[in-house]
A protein has these predicted regions:
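Short gly/ser-rich loop at a beta-strand->alpha-helix junction or flexible surface loop bordering the NTP-binding
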Residues: 1-89, 110-113, 120
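Surface segments flanking catalytic/ligand-binding clefts of nucleic-acid enzymes
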Residues: 67-183
């Protein structure tokens, strides 16, 4: 069919596939990242990498879905690409790995982060990389007021005492979330 595309590789990087059962092999997230480097710009590949390293997945026709755990990490993607000497797309993938982050919880968090920290030549403002969904513990003396023991900051620069929250209407429109966010 027109939706199937075959690719030839002369030598596959180690751990490119996992057995999905009954001998059916599928590409690992790390190998998918490297394969997509042939088709995407650096900025698009970074966005894809943050999805792989995040707790959400974009759906083709509908809202994103949540995942319990990321499919991979920025460190695993970087190590895989570094070990794939001579692979098609490797130069693009290596460049993209410099900008990967772990822990994005939504596509909009990813886009906001990319806008803020990617360099100007990749469409961003060039700020330092933030930490995503960074845990900030609430001091015991303030927990009653805060009604929680910790907060997760969408984007955080702890050294600058700066946090940025992306408040989507979809995620924050529930009455329970609105009262929680108001605090």
């Amino acid at each position: 069919t027109a939706s199937l595309v075959s690719h030839k590789w002369t030598s596959l990087p180690a751990s490119s596939f996992v057995d999905a059962g009954q001998g059916f092999l599928v590409s690992t997230p790390e190998f998918c990242f490297l394969q997509m480097a042939r088709e995407m710009t650096v900025a698009q590949l970074v966005q894809f990498g943050l999805e792989l390293c995040g707790t959400y997945a974009l759906a083709e026709n509908g809202p994103a879905i949540s995942r319990e755990a990321p499919l991979t990490t920025a460190a695993k993607l970087r190590a895989f690409v570094e070990a794939a000497a001579g692979a098609p797309g490797r130069a693009t993938a290596l460049r993209a790995t410099r900008y990967l982050l772990d822990g994005s919880a939504s596509a909009m968090e990813t886009l906001l982060a990319l806008l803020l920290y990617l360099p100007n030549n990749l469409g961003g403002y060039g700020l330092k990389k933030p930490k995503l969904n960074y845990r900030v513990d609430v001091p015991a003396s303030l927990r009653e007021l805060a009604d929680r023991s910790y907060c997760l900051c969408d984007l955080c620069w702890p050294e600058a005492n700066l946090a940025v929250e992306y408040d989507s209407r979809l995620h924050h429109s529930e009455p329970g979330r609105q009262s929680s966010d108001a605090r």
